[in-house]
Amino acid sequence: MVLIRVLANLLILQLSYAQKSSELVIGGDECNINEHRFLALVFNSSGFLCSGTLINQEWVLTAAHCDMENMRIYLGVHNESVQYDDEQTRVPEEKFFCLRSNNDTKWDKDIMLIRLDSPVNNSAHIAPLNLPFNPPMLGSVCRIMGWGAITSPNEIYPDVPHCANINLLHYSMCQAVYPGMPAQSRILCAGIQTGGIDTCSGDSGGPLICNGQFQGILHAGGNPCALPRAPGLYTRVFDYTDWIENIIAGNTDASCPP
């Protein structure tokens, strides 16, 4: 069963490439404090949770299904119970989405570009992640991260983000698991086929970083998390780079790829 992971069901595809389940995000280890300077923590007043990625001082990229009222975006966070001097909080000034057509499926265009109400300052714990300059390569080892659940189906949420490695898989592996996926889409399939490591509730909108490049935005995955042969689904960022760059440059009428 596919689940759009918004608080109760988001993904943290923590697939431990060549490692055992002692290192899970439903598995994974605590992220190094310096490896997620671009990672945004997204909340609203009711506690709805997603992640996002800072791509420059004024813009954050996340999943469209993470859109909500009263959104607050936290940057420079590591331990939710400890506030660092350089933590910064912003709210959206503008939100940009891809226009959907009648031909689009639920898998399409799950991407939201947020302009912050004021620029953030780079610091020891805050720095943007560049957009990809090459398309993703099948078989790549990819990094996932977030504050999502570390157990499933009875979710327990950590105070610190967890990180793990997964593999970029052939699209057909996700087609075989999730009924109704089209023959082609702008979705990446990533995970570990044996299961045991996975993204989970609270990780939606977070980045998939393959060979050092920001290639995916967490869209959906299996429920419960970490089942065998149930990889995660990620919006393919490379396909949207022209749209993103046009919006940032002020061309707000720019169209997304079909």
Swiss-Prot record:
GO cellular component: extracellular region; secretory granule
Entry annotation: catalytic residues: 65, 110, 204
Residues of the signal peptide: 1-18
Enzyme class: hydrolase
Positions annotated as glycosylated: 44, 79, 103, 121
PROSITE patterns: TRYPSIN_DOM (PS50240), TRYPSIN_HIS (PS00134), TRYPSIN_SER (PS00135)
Propeptide: 19-24
Statement: the UniProt record of this protein carries the keyword Cell inner membrane: no
Subunit structure: Monomer.
Family, as annotated: Belongs to the peptidase S1 family. Snake venom subfamily.
Chain's role: Snake venom serine protease that may act in the hemostasis system of the prey.
Protein name (database record): Snake venom serine protease PTLE1
